[in-house]
């Protein structure tokens, strides 16, 4: 898998912006990606040194449209902690 295929998009929420001070960045990643693949992808794309990766899996929610039921896509979210001597990822700057 290519690094750009592993990292889908940044997750910008109130909680994810509050942990930016601790050099923790939140991304939505491919559901098949491992922690090691996420680490190498972040280091390749943003040119930073990753200290730790935490991942969370989310099941798809049941959604109904009248009598038809289906599920939303399952998701995988990664919180990436970069080292103290790494530069900030400018992707999140406003």
Swiss-Prot record:
GO biological process: translation
Gene Ontology CC: ribonucleoprotein complex; ribosome
InterPro entries, alphabetized: Nucleotide-bd_a/b_plait_sf (IPR012677), Ribosomal_uL23-like (IPR013025), Ribosomal_uL23/eL15/eS24_sf (IPR012678)
UniProt KW keywords: Ribonucleoprotein, Ribosomal protein, RNA-binding, rRNA-binding
Record-linked Gene3D superfamilies: 3.30.70.330
GO molecular function, one term: structural constituent of ribosome
Transmembrane parts of this sequence: none
Superkingdom assignment: Bacteria
Quaternary structure, from the entry: Part of the 50S ribosomal subunit. Contacts protein L29, and trigger factor when it is bound to the ribosome.
PANTHER family: 60S RIBOSOMAL PROTEIN L23A
Assigned protein family: Belongs to the universal ribosomal protein uL23 family.
Its biological purpose: One of the early assembly proteins it binds 23S rRNA. One of the proteins that surrounds the polypeptide exit tunnel on the outside of the ribosome. Forms the main docking site for trigger factor binding to the ribosome.
HAMAP family reported for this sequence: Ribosomal_uL23_B
Entry protein name: Large ribosomal subunit protein uL23
Species this protein is from: Listeria welshimeri serovar 6b (strain ATCC 35897 / DSM 20650 / CCUG 15529 / CIP 8149 / NCTC 11857 / SLCC 5334 / V8)
Gene: rplW
């Amino acid at each position: 898998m290519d690094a750009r295929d592993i990292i889908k998009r940044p997750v910008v929420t109130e909680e994810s912006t509050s942990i930016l001070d601790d050099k923790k960045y939140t991304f939505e990643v491919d559901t098949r990606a491992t922690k090691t693949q996420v680490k190498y992808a972040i280091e390749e794309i943003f040119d930073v040194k990753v200290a730790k990766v935490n991942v969370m899996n989310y099941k798809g929610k049941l959604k109904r449209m009248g009598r038809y039921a289906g599920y939303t896509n399952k998701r995988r979210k990664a919180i990436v902690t970069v080292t103290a001597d790494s530069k900030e990822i400018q992707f999140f700057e406003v």
